[in-house]
């Protein structure tokens, strides 16, 4: 277990877990990160050959967590005070599940949700991730927005009266 407080304001209350690694694989049964406002739990298993030039092995990763307002604002950095004040005091809920290797990676779950503001869901498959020329993929995307009034503050005081952000829906693949 570890604890730290960084000059930027990031405070890690605890980072706990364990991993096993040998010459062929890495196993992280559980790794938990806690800050005063956030909680993230990850699990991963990886054959080291999954990231080789000719990927053979498999990897799997799971992430679940909640990113609190203070941590979101800290990582975003330099946001206008009006946005900081207007941003909802709710955590961003995250879920991720992926399996495969650098040749073929299946995204079975990608979710991000901020209560009352938005919900994003995606899944898909990506191919040849390490090949900048032949990289490809197919992702199904579903985004629902609700009250995004807090985002209007990013446009500045003058533009606030001219911007409307109604609830929206975006579906794509």
Predicted regions and their residues:
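Extended lipid/amphipathic-ligand handling interfaces
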Residues: 2-4, 14-24, 30-35, 40-63, ...
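Low-complexity, polar/charged sequence tracts that form flexible coils or short amphipathic helices
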Residues: 10-11
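Gram-negative outer-membrane beta-barrel proteins
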Residues: 52, 67-75, 106, 118, ...
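Extracytoplasmic loops and strand-loop junctions of Gram-negative outer membrane beta-barrel proteins
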Residues: 77-80, 154-156
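Extended hydrophobic/Leu-rich segments
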Residues: 143, 148-151, 160-163
